[in-house]
Amino acid sequence: MIRTVDIYDTPMIGVFATCTEDVVLVPTGTKPETCAILEDSLDARIVETLVNGSVVIGALSRGNSNGFLYSYGTDAGEMKELTGVEAEILPGKLNAVGNIVLANDSAALVHPELSDKAIEVIASTLKVEVYRGTIAGIKNVGMAGVVTNKGLLVHPKVTASEIETLEKLFELPVNIGTTNFGTQMLGSGLLANSKNYLAGSDTTGPELGRIEEALGFLE
């Protein structure tokens, strides 16, 4: 089984791509063989696109089975057509969506300084409960963790009170880990849904083991 991959010849796959149960958004120009690995491993449809003209799709978008949120400047209508689910632009200055929203199909943890209006848009688009918070004191929660409908993996320096909040919000046990040989902002190097995962190519065997345990892939 293939467990690691690069996108644009970099292991920072969570910066360049994002996925849900049904869709993997990858930047235009991703190698066909990479697309094939992503599609096969995650059992989800590949959509090649740009977000606001940029290739860092993972940093600028976040979705679940109900919808996707995108940064300012994205054509929401076009994205809705491409993905087949709701598409909205996150309002306000803080809108590198993938960096600041951590979400699955039941809940979302978001940057603590997001406006009430932004919270409303997230809740209505993703159809989830939304809570402001941090992970390891970091406000960019979207890259400080990875959550699926089966598991939750976060930054190693997460605090006890943050763990309590995360477990209550997502109703999943919290596990800690890293990707790409010690990267604590592990979301930058991991794509996962409830069916499978792929990590960046620098991710070590022990790191892969933690990912598999946290996200429920151990037999």
UniProtKB/Swiss-Prot annotation:
Q: Which NCBIfam families match?
A: eIF-6, PRK04046.2-1
**What is the purpose of this protein?**
Binds to the 50S ribosomal subunit and prevents its association with the 30S ribosomal subunit to form the 70S initiation complex.
- Record flagged with keyword Protein biosynthesis: yes
InterPro entries attached to this UniProt entry: eIF6 (IPR002769)
Any Pfam family: eIF-6
Extract one GO BP annotation from the record: cytosolic ribosome assembly
- Which UniProt key words apply to this protein? Initiation factor, Protein biosynthesis
**What's the protein here called?**
Translation initiation factor 6
UniProt GO MF annotations = ribosome binding; translation initiation factor activity
Q: Which family does it belong to?
A: Belongs to the eIF-6 family.
